[in-house]
Structures are given as structure tokens and as C-alpha cells.
């Protein structure tokens, strides 16, 4: 793409120039602006700082650095807030149903402020999971020059010589309930797992999305794996601000960057790093916001050609800080580019192409580390996020399939219409090896809000059942989940999807080799069960949950609210 130089205040001049805008300027003067400032770009800083969660409680210093960078580069910083939900704190409660809703609220906040205030650009700062897609969706809707600053990953905790993170605590709950861990060890893990600020440390959802944003070119190189407490994260925020001012001069906008080829690059990086199932849902929504033709089947196309190169949690050994020390996302991208698995001609926010950004990165990983494997000797030959179909999910669903000892299982259904009763059954020892748990009426409309299921899956793993019990749901999974799990089943139960018609004890097959999710009954029996079915009454009749349930599209389309 050819870039062009334009005036620095192409939008804000609508409220700062001319005699008729004297009242507008008067309000700016009240905040300390001077006449010369009205020729400068007005740049929004969407600040996700919050003391709700450690993921976001370290963001203010990044916002301060970004503000300084904007001013040093000749811009005016206009700060506004965006909300967050702590997935880790809300997990396993009714509050988790607000997590995906917050993605939409965040994107609405950014679009509203940028458009309502005629901002010339926007720098978005976020930490917890939904901050990431929500931020980018808002950037794409507003489509002014924009850059994303990720808050940074958390450092690992430690107990008895073992690295810990938040998922360690969820799994410890299951171990304790199964009699495999003492109360004292559970207490010490609880206290030591999270030593400070930053987002959850494995290749969970926040780190997955930040890595993908770096691959998209909407964030700076190396920025996605930096730790929040480290000075380089603050320096990166300041540099991001200066790069954004240059992008305003060149009129580089989010939709120039987030193209179909760029999304293919991002998904290839997600596969290569062993990223979260949530990335499937979020990139369907991001593509929708960008106006890009991208379907759930495109993930499978990229998966089949992309190896898993990184040994990262939840199913691997290392954390994001280890990936950073090993060369970060640029190292992974250069390996994929050299193998012909990345589009090098995609533009980045720096004004350079992907190939130009990666020019000086070596094609092979360093020999003194084992976080990133050589492309000739990958962790797995194909990606880990598979799209399964079958009579239980004709629109598709998402499974993590790498690292499983048994990639195929058939077992009796154990049916639950809510998460809490499923968790109680696991902790009470009522779920046995070979069972296939079904958690339904938890989709975008049915939940509503499509909650994540880390509490049940963590309990299964802690109880030693992670490899021997299957779990399928029309809800979602945390990025920290691993095991024989299948989520995003679509159509969902509340929309009359076939998952609604599973009976206790029915035979279900999960086949990650044939990409199949099947209820083993006849078509005639399935149709018989549908007779007389009615959608359940809405769980909410007012507020954001009611709006979400009424408007949300299928998970196979990203669970977006504006698919009209």
C-alpha cells in the first residue's frame, strides 16, 4: 500500500476551527489547551486501567507513558476510560456471563468516544481477555489511525520449586477435592500463584490475542510478550504513541492493516504458539468489524498447514515471559515467513511491511532455548485448534486437539443445564473415566453471554480425569483449558441446536481425527425429540444481558451484536 501525508487534524478541525466553534474551543481552554493546540491531532487514549484485576491494575503507568509520547510527538492526548471484567475472578459464577458482554461494551465505548469527539487517532490500552478483541473491534469501527498497547503479561509465581499461574489454582481445587493435595498446599498455591500485575501468564486468551495483534501489525514488534512490571513495557507504550502520530501523518488506518491476509497471518501465529480457543470467536467478530470475509472454516484451512512451534502452557511447559526471552513473536513469525506460511507484504502500523519488520530476525530459533522449536522439528505438525462438525454441531465447534493421548472417544452423556451442577458433580466424584459431560444452555443467547468453563475443566484435570473425560458445551473455555474439550457448539441449545436434545446416557463421539462431533442416535429419533420443544424463557429481561441475548449472533459468526 502506498502511504500519503495529510494534515494532522483532519477530523478534530470539525470542532476546533472557525468562528462557529468558539463555544467548543472555550471548553478546551477550560482544560488548559492553548490556541496552538488546535492545529495538533487530538488523539484518544482509551485507558483500561482498573483495580478490579491484576491484568489491568498496572495500566496507568502505561497510559502516562503513552500520554507523554503523544505530547512529545506533537499531539494532544485525550484520555477516556474503558471497563473490564476479571475473567479469573468471575469464573464459575453468574458474573462470568458478563465477560463476553464486556467485549461489546468496550468496543462501543471506543467507537462512541472516537466518533463523538472527532478524534484524529486513538491509542488503546488493555489487559484482561476481552479488552483485546473489544479494543480492536472499536478501533476498526471508528477506523481512524490507531495502535493497540497490551498491558503485558504477569510474572510466574512459585511454590516448592514449581512455577505457578492462575490456572494452577483452578487445578489445585480439583486435586484437593480428589484427595490428591492437602489444604495447606492449596492455601499456599492460592497465595503465591500471582505475584503482581499483568495478564495471566501462559498462552491463554490475553496473551494469545496480544500475539495475534502483533502479527496483524496493529501493535509494535516484541510488545506482546513483555511483562507488565518491566520498564521495557512502559518504553514500548511511549514508542507506540510516537508511532501512532506518524501513522496519522501517513493516514494508516486499522482497516488498511486488518485484511484477510493479515488475519491469516494472525491465525497462523495463534496456531504456531498454541493459543486459546477464544481466538476463534474473537477473530470472527474482528473480521466482521473489519468488513473482511472470514468464516469458521478458514481457521481449519490455516490450521492444517501450520505447525505448533512453541511449548507453552496450558498444554505445554513454558510461559509468555519465556517466549519473550527466546525471541518473542517476531522469531515465530520469521520462521513462518521463511517457510512460506505468512504473507510478508501485509502493512503494519509502522508503515513497513511484515517482511520489512522481520528483515533482521534470524530464520531459525536460538539453540540455547527450547521454548520455540525448529520448524523442521515442531511440537505438532498441524495446528491445535480444530473445527469439528457433525449432527451435534452442523455450524461448527472448536476443539483443542494436540497433546491428547486419546484423540477419539465415545462415551455416555452426562447432561447438565448449568455450570454449577456440573462442577458439583465433578467435585463429588460422580463423573467417571469415559463419560462425556454436556454443558448446555450456556451459549451467546442461552447463558446468556457464553461463559467460560475453567472451573469444571480445571476440576477435571485436578481430579486426574483431564484425558479420560470429554466435555462439550455451547459455552466457551478459558484460554487456560486443556483436555478433551469441545466448545462453541453451534447452533446453541437455546436456539434449538441439537445439543438441546441429548438425553442422559446417550452415546456421544468426539473424533479429533475425523473432525467429528456426533450424537449416536438415528436421524428419526433426533427429529422425534424435537417435537414440542420450546425455547426457554430469557434469563434476563432488562439490561445488558437482555440486550446481548436478544441480539447476539451464533458463535459460528462470532457472537456479534450488529450482524443485521
From Swiss-Prot:
Its cofactor is [2Fe-2S] cluster; Mg(2+). One of its GO terms (biological process) is isoleucine biosynthetic process. Its EC number is 4.2.1.9. Transmembrane segments: none annotated. Gene3D superfamilies: IlvD/EDD C-terminal domain-like (3.50.30.80). It holds the Pfam family ILVD_EDD_N. InterPro entries: DHAD_IlvD/Edd, Dihydro-acid_dehy_C, DihydroxyA_deHydtase, DiOHA_6PGluconate_deHydtase_CS, ILV_EDD_C, ILV_EDD_N, IlvD/EDD_N. SUPFAM superfamilies: IlvD/EDD N-terminal domain-like (SSF143975), LeuD/IlvD-like (SSF52016). Binds 1 [2Fe-2S] cluster per subunit. This cluster acts as a Lewis acid cofactor. Mg(2+) binds at residues 87, 129-130, 452. GO terms for molecular function: 2 iron, 2 sulfur cluster binding; dihydroxy-acid dehydratase activity; magnesium ion binding. Pathway: Amino-acid biosynthesis; L-isoleucine biosynthesis; L-isoleucine from 2-oxobutanoate: step 3/4; Amino-acid biosynthesis; L-valine biosynthesis; L-valine from pyruvate: step 3/4. The modification N6-carboxylysine is found at residue 130. Signal peptide: none annotated. [2Fe-2S] cluster binds at residues 55, 128, 200. It catalyses: (2R)-2,3-dihydroxy-3-methylbutanoate = 3-methyl-2-oxobutanoate + H2O; (2R,3R)-2,3-dihydroxy-3-methylpentanoate = (S)-3-methyl-2-oxopentanoate + H2O. The active site is at residue 478. PROSITE patterns: ILVD_EDD_1 (PS00886), ILVD_EDD_2 (PS00887). PANTHER family: DIHYDROXY-ACID DEHYDRATASE DAD (PTHR21000), DIHYDROXY-ACID DEHYDRATASE, MITOCHONDRIAL (PTHR21000:SF5). Functions in the biosynthesis of branched-chain amino acids. Catalyzes the dehydration of (2R,3R)-2,3-dihydroxy-3-methylpentanoate (2,3-dihydroxy-3-methylvalerate) into 2-oxo-3-methylpentanoate (2-oxo-3-methylvalerate) and of (2R)-2,3-dihydroxy-3-methylbutanoate (2,3-dihydroxyisovalerate) into 2-oxo-3-methylbutanoate (2-oxoisovalerate), the penultimate precursor to L-isoleucine and L-valine, respectively. Belongs to the IlvD/Edd family. Homodimer. This is Dihydroxy-acid dehydratase. It comes from Polaromonas sp. (strain JS666 / ATCC BAA-500).
Amino acid at each position: 500500500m502506498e502511504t500519503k501525508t495529510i494534515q494532522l487534524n483532519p477530523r478534530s478541525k470539525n470542532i476546533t476551527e472557525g468562528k462557529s466553534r468558539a463555544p467548543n474551543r472555550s471548553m478546551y481552554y477550560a482544560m488548559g489547551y492553548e490556541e496552538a493546540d488546535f492545529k495538533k491531532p487530538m488523539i484518544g487514549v482509551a485507558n483500561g486501567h482498573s483495580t478490579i484485576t491484576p491484568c489491568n491494575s498496572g495500566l496507568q503507568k502505561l497510559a502516562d507513558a503513552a500520554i507523554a509520547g503523544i505530547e512529545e510527538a506533537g499531539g494532544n492526548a485525550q484520555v477516556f476510560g474503558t471497563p473490564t471484567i476479571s475473567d479469573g475472578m468471575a469464573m464459575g459464577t453468574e458474573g462470568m456471563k458478563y465477560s463476553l458482554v464486556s467485549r461489546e461494551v468496550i468496543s462501543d465505548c471506543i467507537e462512541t468516544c472516537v466518533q463523538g469527539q472527532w478524534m484524529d487517532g486513538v491509542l488503546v490500552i488493555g489487559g484482561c481477555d476481552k479488552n483485546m478483541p473489544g479494543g480492536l473491534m472499536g478501533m476498526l469501527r471508528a477506523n481512524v489511525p490507531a495502535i493497540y498497547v497490551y498491558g503485558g503479561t504477569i510474572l510466574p509465581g512459585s511454590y516448592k520449586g514449581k512455577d505457578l499461574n492462575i490456572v494452577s489454582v483452578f487445578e489445585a481445587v480439583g486435586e484437593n477435592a480428589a484427595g490428591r493435595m492437602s489444604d495447606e498446599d492449596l492455601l499456599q498455591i492460592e497465595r503465591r500463584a500471582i505475584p503482581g500485575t499483568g495478564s495471566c501468564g501462559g498462552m491463554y486468551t490475553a496473551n494469545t490475542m496480544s500475539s495475534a495483534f502483533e502479527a496483524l501489525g496493529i501493535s509494535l514488534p516484541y510488545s506482546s510478550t513483555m511483562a507488565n512490571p518491566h520498564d521495557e513495557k512502559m518504553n514500548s507504550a511511549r514508542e507506540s504513541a510516537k508511532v501512532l502520530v506518524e501513522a496519522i501523518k501517513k493516514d494508516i488506518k486499522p482497516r488498511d492493516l486488518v485484511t484477510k491476509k493479515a488475519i491469516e497471518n494472525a491465525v497462523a501465529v495463534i496456531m504456531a504458539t498454541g493459543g486459546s480457543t477464544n481466538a476463534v470467536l474473537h477473530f470472527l467478530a474482528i473480521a466482521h468489524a473489519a468488513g473482511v470475509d472470514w468464516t469458521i472454516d478458514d481457521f481449519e484451512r490455516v490450521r492444517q498447514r501450520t505447525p505448533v512451534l512453541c511449548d507453552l502452557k496450558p498444554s505445554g511447559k513454558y510461559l509468555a515471559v519465556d517466549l519473550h526471552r527466546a525471541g518473542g513473536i517476531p522469531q515465530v513469525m520469521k520462521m513462518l515467513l521463511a517457510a512460506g506460511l505468512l504473507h510478508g507484504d501485509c502493512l503494519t502500523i509502522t508503515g513497513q511491511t511484515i517482511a520489512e519488520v522481520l528483515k533482521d530476525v534470524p530464520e531459525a530459533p536460538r539453540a540455547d532455548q527450547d521454548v520455540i522449536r525448529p520448524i523442521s522439528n515442531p511440537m505438532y505438525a498441524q495446528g491445535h485448534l480444530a473445527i469439528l462438525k457433525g449432527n451435534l454441531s452442523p455450524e461448527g465447534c472448536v476443539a483443542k486437539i494436540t497433546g491428547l493421548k486419546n484423540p477419539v472417544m465415545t462415551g455416555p452423556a452426562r447432561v447438565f443445564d448449568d455450570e454449577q451442577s456440573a462442577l458439583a458433580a465433578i467435585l463429588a466424584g460422580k463423573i467417571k473415566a469415559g463419560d462425556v459431560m454436556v454443558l448446555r444452555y450456556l451459549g451467546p443467547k442461552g447463558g446468556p453471554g457464553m461463559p467460560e468453563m475453567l472451573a469444571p475443566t480445571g476440576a477435571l484435570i485436578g481430579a486426574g480425569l483431564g484425558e479420560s473425560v470429554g466435555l462439550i458445551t455451547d459455552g466457551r473455555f478459558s484460554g487456560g483449558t486443556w483436555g478433551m474439550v469441545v466448545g462453541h457448539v453451534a447452533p446453541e441449545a437455546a436456539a434449538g441446536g441439537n445439543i438441546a436434545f441429548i438425553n442422559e446416557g446417550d452415546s456421544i463421539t468426539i473424533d479429533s481425527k475425523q473432525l467429528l462431533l456426533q450424537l449416536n442416535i438415528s436421524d428419526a429419533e433426533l427429529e422425534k425429540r424435537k417435537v414440542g420443544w420450546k425455547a426457554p424463557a430469557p434469563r434476563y429481561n432488562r439490561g445488558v444481558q437482555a440486550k446481548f441475548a436478544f441480539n447476539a449472533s451464533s458463535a459460528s459468526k462470532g457472537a456479534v451484536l450488529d450482524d443485521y
